[in-house]
Amino acid sequence: MRSLAISAEGMSTQQKFLEVISSNIANAETTRTPEGGPYRRQIATIGADAASGRATASTITDTRAGRLIYDPGHPDADKDGFVAYPNVDINTELVDLMIARRVHEANASVFQAAKSMLRRALEI
């Protein structure tokens, strides 16, 4: 039973990664946020709850500078005509997406194998 819970927890954690990556991709060109300035890339991290030992997913904001593109006609251009774009690199996000997908698939395989073993044990 524990193996089912562990793999389900792993899939749930990877879901958080997928949500963060999706948000980054969706906001890759967002130059204005309610907080002001361009969107900042979010990074999902995994930690462990000391009391329960369970994995926890959280997000942090990537503080690296984004791209500056000269576009004096853009509504968000500064006095010199530059627009600050998010610090999101689509290629990085796509690689992270593939990794998260593979980890999710691995957890799903473990879940299916554990379920199959439990069924066989109940037949005995």
What label would you give each PLM region?
Residues M1-I124:
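Amphipathic alpha-helical polymerization modules
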